[in-house]
């Protein structure tokens, strides 16, 4: 859709340039701009035609396309998750807040249990519980992630197919993670507040809840964002947003060099909660202190550094991701 729209726009720009040339006489710079526009349109058309041809050729020969051969969970882990940096932030922040090391972690909405596995890999005294209501994705995690752990390490990971609002663990945990915005599946204050109260019950006396959140004025728009990765493209789509209810529908798509696509590999039907709402709900649930950790920026470039610190004022950027840290 966006390629087609871009091609139309370029054609219109090329038309304006040519119209000016015909009316006012040839101008070298305008001629170059016109030709560049035509060349870009031609390249876009050629790439689209070649991709369609590749897909059709694969199907004609009975071969599977790259999209058909790909595993959506592998693509997700490569494009969305960075468990190493997440581990570093959680362990470092907990130690700074509580003056001790966290050992027992619960990963809510754990999916393929990537963070559970990262947690037990780091220290021999670390244990983890992953909770997800989807049994299929838990099975995938057992087969592809837990199986790769060193002998004995997998015994320190428990995966539970349960509702995060009802789950209990044998003993209180040091840390609960609710990452990748999954808690936004709860669309009412009653539902989300109930989840937060359940988390509070499951934490040790000095336990901490870690969450991420996203926002910015572009998060309310119906847009697509593309990111090129090794061997595929990741596409994040805001398919619809309702400003009255706050409900947002998002999709993750993947596209491949042969022109094939994995459309709607993942779909998220959420409420886009704001930071003030989340802080209020966490406080109402009984957490003693709630802080927003905002990404720091480089003074020279203005770009994010990947480091997060407590903040009470944030930049009104088009898009941002931050962490919420709630202490029991």
Model-inferred region functions:
Residues 210-281:
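SAM-dependent methyltransferase
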Residues 141-142:
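Conserved SAM-binding loop
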Residues 168-176:
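A short acidic, Gly/Pro-enriched loop at the edge of an enzyme's catalytic core
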Residues 112-125:
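Conserved SAM-binding loop of SAM-dependent methyltransferases across substrates and taxa
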Residues 192-205:
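A short glycine-rich, Lys/Arg-flanked "PGG" loop and its adjoining helix->strand segment in the class I
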Residues 272-328:
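C-terminal lobe and adjacent flexible extensions of AdoMet/dcAdoMet transferase-like proteins
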Residues 149-164:
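Conserved SAM-binding strand-loop segment of SAM-dependent methyltransferases
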Residues 101-111:
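Conserved class I S-adenosyl-L-methionine
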